[in-house]
Amino acid sequence: MSRLGIMVLTLLLLVFIVTSHQDAGEKQATKRAAVNFRWRRSFTRRAAAEECEEYCEEEEKTCCGEEDGEPVCAEFCLG
């Protein structure tokens, strides 16, 4: 094989390695952003659930969730 052929193959290999490394970095950044979003969403849900529990506790009932932003309280939650 000529030197030119070896240089071309080496260059192609380097391009392949660099692009695959960039793709891995983008995937990792996307995964990190998804985890951060999931954590924020669970934190806000937890805060809303605590508010619902406190509100229904005053009425001596169980919090069954929220509907239109308002806590739903009942003796027993169905479904």
UniProtKB/Swiss-Prot annotation:
Localization per record: Secreted
Disulfide bond residue pairs: C52-C64, C56-C73, C63-C77
Tissue-specific expression: Expressed by the venom duct.
UniProt keyword list: Amidation, Cleavage on pair of basic residues, Disulfide bond, Knottin, Neurotoxin, Secreted, Signal, Toxin
Signal peptide span: 1-20
Main location: secreted
Membership in a protein family: Belongs to the conotoxin O3 superfamily.
Protein name: Conotoxin ArMSGL-0123
UniProt organism field: Conus arenatus (Sand-dusted cone)
